[in-house]
Amino acid sequence: MYAIIETGGKQVKVEEGQTVYIEKLAAEAGETVTFENVLFVGGDTVKVGNPSVAGATVTAKVEKQGRGKKITVFKYKPKKNNHKKQGHRQPYTKVVIEKINA
């Protein structure tokens, strides 16, 4: 059984027992979070939401909070002696999907 959930402005396909990296959540490591915006549930029977499946939830356990690899942003304007170098590390939350309730 799998589900498609929406979190952090993104849609993520999840299965029970799967580890997923998602946009940062306000939860500490070891806490349980519930995703209620379930768009699709697949398996023996298929349920498609309009826009979300009524009564369906996905339960996950927060494994850790972290920050992704550093990327470098470099803006440059030719002939103007104008450049800007900036780094960015995107925060994420690592969760383990425990149960899909549909």
UniProtKB/Swiss-Prot annotation:
SUPFAM superfamilies linked: L21p-like (SSF141091)
What sections of the protein cross the membrane? none
Gene Ontology molecular function terms on file: rRNA binding; structural constituent of ribosome
Annotated InterPro entries: bL21-like, bL21-like_sf, Ribosomal_bL21, Ribosomal_bL21_CS
Entry keyword annotation includes GTP-binding: no
* GO CC list: cytoplasm; ribonucleoprotein complex; ribosome
**Single Gene Ontology BP term?**
translation
PROSITE patterns assigned:
RIBOSOMAL_L21
Keywords carried by this UniProt record: Ribonucleoprotein, Ribosomal protein, RNA-binding, rRNA-binding
Q: Which Pfam families match?
A: Ribosomal_L21p (PF00829)
RNA-binding found in the keyword field: yes
Q: To which protein family does this belong? A: Belongs to the bacterial ribosomal protein bL21 family.
Q: Matching PANTHER family, A to Z?
A: 50S RIBOSOMAL PROTEIN L21, LARGE RIBOSOMAL SUBUNIT PROTEIN BL21M
What exactly does this protein do?
This protein binds to 23S rRNA in the presence of protein L20.
NCBIfam families linked to this entry: L21 (TIGR00061)
Looking up HAMAP family in the UniProt record yields: Ribosomal_bL21
**Record note on quaternary structure:** Part of the 50S ribosomal subunit. Contacts protein L20.
Name this polypeptide is given: Large ribosomal subunit protein bL21
Which species is the source of this protein? Bacillus pumilus (strain SAFR-032)
